[in-house]
From Swiss-Prot:
<dbReference type="Pfam" id="PF17557">
    <property type="entry name" value="Conotoxin_I2"/>
</dbReference>
<dbReference type="InterPro" id="IPR020242">
    <property type="entry name" value="Conotoxin_I2"/>
</dbReference>
<feature type="disulfide bond">
    <location>
        <begin position="34"/>
        <end position="46"/>
    </location>
</feature>
<dbReference type="GO" id="GO:0005576">
    <property type="term" value="C:extracellular region"/>
</dbReference>
<feature type="disulfide bond">
    <location>
        <begin position="45"/>
        <end position="54"/>
    </location>
</feature>
<feature type="disulfide bond">
    <location>
        <begin position="27"/>
        <end position="41"/>
    </location>
</feature>
<keyword id="KW-0027">Amidation</keyword>
<comment type="similarity">
    <text>Belongs to the conotoxin I2 superfamily.</text>
</comment>
<feature type="modified residue" description="Aspartic acid 1-amide">
    <location>
        <position position="57"/>
    </location>
</feature>
<dbReference type="InterPro" id="IPR013141">
    <property type="entry name" value="Conotoxin-I_CS"/>
</dbReference>
<keyword id="KW-0732">Signal</keyword>
<keyword id="KW-0964">Secreted</keyword>
<feature type="signal peptide">
    <location>
        <begin position="1"/>
        <end position="26"/>
    </location>
</feature>
<keyword id="KW-0800">Toxin</keyword>
<protein>
    <recommendedName>
        <fullName>Conotoxin Im11.2</fullName>
    </recommendedName>
</protein>
<keyword id="KW-1015">Disulfide bond</keyword>
<feature type="propeptide">
    <location>
        <begin position="61"/>
        <end position="64"/>
    </location>
</feature>
Length: 64
């Protein structure tokens, strides 16, 4: 009985660890805050926000 309880708890611990790895490696969607481009799903971090394409407000900002 002790062996079965130990193996079940180890199995559950592995599942929890795998879920944590998946959650920490998930990319961020457009509109989410970011610090680096690799954190965003489209690999585009503009002024601490995931945006694709990068839109720079200014004189000639004509992206549509």
């Amino acid at each position: 009985m002790m062996f079965r309880l130990t193996s079940v708890s180890c199995f559950l611990l592995v599942i929890v660890c795998l879920n944590l790895v998946v959650l920490t490696n998930a990319c961020r969607l457009e509109g989410s805050s970011c610090r680096r481009s690799y954190q965003c799903c489209h690999k585009s971090c503009c002024i601490r926000e995931c945006k694709f394409p990068c839109r720079w407000d200014g004189k000639r900002a004509t992206f549509q």
